[in-house]
UniProtKB/Swiss-Prot annotation:
Pathway: Pyrimidine metabolism; dUMP biosynthesis; dUMP from dCTP: step 1/1. It comes from Corynebacterium efficiens (strain DSM 44549 / YS-314 / AJ 12310 / JCM 11189 / NBRC 100395). The gene is dcd. Bifunctional enzyme that catalyzes both the deamination of dCTP to dUTP and the hydrolysis of dUTP to dUMP without releasing the toxic dUTP intermediate. Homotrimer. This is dCTP deaminase, dUMP-forming.
Length: 193
């Protein structure tokens, strides 16, 4: 069941759903608008010959902090990681789905590549996977609305929510745009093959 604005407010007011910083004006009829933070991760295209998900390529990205009052310029064909200004803490019975804002999509900005699902129990800033598919550069301003988070009531609370020790939740508590930790999905047995 998709939460309505009134159910989103109830969940926040009860302390069930955590959003920090919270602005009540961000609540939409069936979602919460999310804003862009000032941190971006850019890819170091000359450091590696290719991306290998099996390897920990620490120097694949560099963190860039945009100065107050300045935008980040995303050029055509570029892909960067960014993050929401807001930190979200989802209870064990709510899951989220991040979508872009239609006004930005109409300009050629894609907000996420594939990772729009937010598990119950997640706590942290949501990493955004931004792509410019337009023919012109797009300026990205810290604090601008960049997406919307829809929340779904689950049929029952998750038995093993995100962040549980047994899951190996790699992105729990993340702050800022967090690079891939996909290499942790490969076991040491696979590494010896």
């Amino acid at each position: 069941m998709l939460l309505s604005d009134r159910d989103i407010r109830k969940s926040i007011d009860s302390g069930d759903l955590g959003i920090d910083p919270f602005d009540p004006l961000l609540i939409q009829p069936s979602s919460i608008d999310v804003r862009m933070d000032r941190y971006f991760r850019v890819f170091n295209n000359s450091k590696y010959t290719h991306i290998d998900p099996k390897l920990n390529q620490d120097e694949l990205t560099s963190l860039v902090e945009v100065a107050d009052g300045d935008p980040f310029v995303l050029h055509p064909g570029e892909f960067v990681l960014a993050a929401t200004l807001e930190k979200f803490t989802l209870p064990h019975h709510l899951a989220g789905r991040l979508e872009g804002k239609s006004s930005l999509g109409r300009l050629g900005l894609l907000t996420h590549s594939t990772a729009g699902f937010i598990d119950p129990g997640f706590s942290g800033h949501i990493t955004l996977e931004l792509s410019n598919v337009a023919n012109l550069p797009i300026t990205l301003w810290p604090g601008m609305k960049v997406g919307q988070l829809a929340l779904f009531m689950m049929s029952s609370p998750a038995e093993t929510p995100y962040g549980s020790g047994s899951l190996g939740s790699k992105y729990q508590g993340q702050r800022g745009p967090t690079p891939s930790k996909g290499y942790l999905n490969f076991s040491s047995e696979q590494d010896s093959d």
